[in-house]
Amino acid sequence: MLREVIYCGICSYPPEYCEFSGKLKRCKVWLSENHADLYAKLYGTDDNTQEVEAVTNKLAESSIGEAREEKLEKDLLKIQKKQENREQRELAKKLSSKVIIKREARTKRKFIVAISGLEVFDIDMKKLAKTFASRFATGCSVSKNAEKKEEVVIQGDVMDEVETYIHSLLEEKGLKDVKVETIDAKKKKKPAAEGAAK
C-alpha cells in the first residue's frame, strides 16, 4: 500500500524529523497552518501540550538562532555564486584560448608536428600522444616547449590528419568555437658560399 509522505515547507524534512533541522519554531507554525491534523497528531492537544511546547521552545532556542541561520543561508548563496562565476570564467578562458599545430622541417624530407595549447582543456597529454602514435604509426612524445608548457610532438608529416582529429576531439568536449591555428615553419636553406659561386 502506497503512503503519501508530507514534507515540511520550511526545512524539507518529513514533519516527524523537523526537530533535527534547527528550524523547529517555523516548522511548527507551517505545519499548524497547512496540516492541522498532523500537527495535532505529532504535538498533541492534551494538557501536557504546554509542557511539550516549553521543552521544544528550549530546544529550538538552544539550536541555531534565526539570525545566525539566515546568515548561514546567505553565506551558502555567496559560495554558490562564486562557484558559478568561477565556472563561467573557466569556460570563457577555454573558449578564448587557441590550439597551435606547428609543422617544422627536421632534415631533408623529414618533418615533426608540434601541438600546443591543449593543457587548458583538461586533456591528458600522455594519452593523446599514445593515441597519435597508434593512429598514425609514428613516434610521438610529450615535451615542454620554450614557454614551459606541455606540447605533443609527432614525427612525420601528419598535420592535416592531426588538425581534423583535434577538431573532432574539441567538438566531443562541446568546444566548437575554439580556434585551431596551423603554422607551417620551413627551415631556411643556407645560402651557398660566396667564394664557390664565383
From Swiss-Prot:
Q: Name one GO cellular component term.
A: ribosome
One GO molecular function term?
A: translation initiation factor activity
Q: Which SUPFAM superfamilies match?
A: eIF1-like (SSF55159)
Ordered alphabetically, the record's keywords are: Cytoplasm, Ribonucleoprotein, Ribosomal protein
Specify the superkingdom.
Eukaryota
What CDD domains does its record include? DENR_C (cd11607)
Q: Does the keyword Ribosomal protein apply?
A: yes
Q: Which GO terms describe its biological process?
A: formation of translation preinitiation complex; nuclear-transcribed mRNA catabolic process, nonsense-mediated decay; ribosome disassembly; translation reinitiation
Principal localization?
A: cytoplasm
Q: Does the record's keyword annotation contain ATP-binding?
A: no
Instruction: Give the location in the cell.
Output: Cytoplasm
- Chain ranges of the SUI1 domain: 99-170
- UniProt similarity note: Belongs to the DENR family.
Summarize the subunit comment. Answer: Interacts with the 40S ribosomal subunit.
Remaining remarks: Present with 21600 molecules/cell in log phase SD medium.
Q: What is known of its domains?
A: The SUI1 domain may be involved in RNA binding.
Q: What is this protein called?
A: Translation machinery-associated protein 22
Q: Which organism is it from?
A: Saccharomyces cerevisiae (strain ATCC 204508 / S288c)
Gene expressing this chain? TMA22
